[in-house]
Amino acid sequence: MFFEFGCCYLLSYRVVQLVVLCLEEFLGEFAIMFHMNKQAKNTVCLWYEKDAQAAAEFYAATFPDSKVGAIFQAPSDFPGGKEGDVLTVEFTVCGVPCFGLNGGPFFKQSEAFSFQIATDNQEETDRYWNAIVGNGGQESACGWCKDRWGVSWQITPRVLTDALAAGGAEAKRAFDAMMTMQKIDVAAIEAARRG
């Protein structure tokens, strides 16, 4: 009896998964974002002056597991804009659900919030760093940079976080090396780990 119930439950679960996959294929990105937003209890909200859609499209083109979802436009004229203006954009960055709000010039981005992107090698580190900085962004120290909308990013090779987590002399050497860098140099961090 239990075995039969378990098999029926597993079969039902697989059928639901298949239905979701078919809906995603049939409805495209809308179904994916609808499914994601129904699951998310916490969404990062980012305030942009006016370019939330451009930012979301850039992130989707730059990072894996990233996409643009629903775009909401003003249904009528309002004090800060006109009918048809983009008000909000739903998007994901590396699987993290986000919500871009075109709120005007009142609040600026700061380093108090940043995305930290873990990378596996120098090529991946360079790719993300160059995409952000080369698209109107700005370099900072210790693996930090800003995109052209002022959002801060930490492009962090795993070798650095592993070295810092090791503690002791290895962590000190890696930390001291990191403090001299803008974009993280993986080979230099590996050399510092070895001493």
Short names for language-model regions:
Residues 169-195:
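C-terminal cap/linker of serine protease catalytic domains
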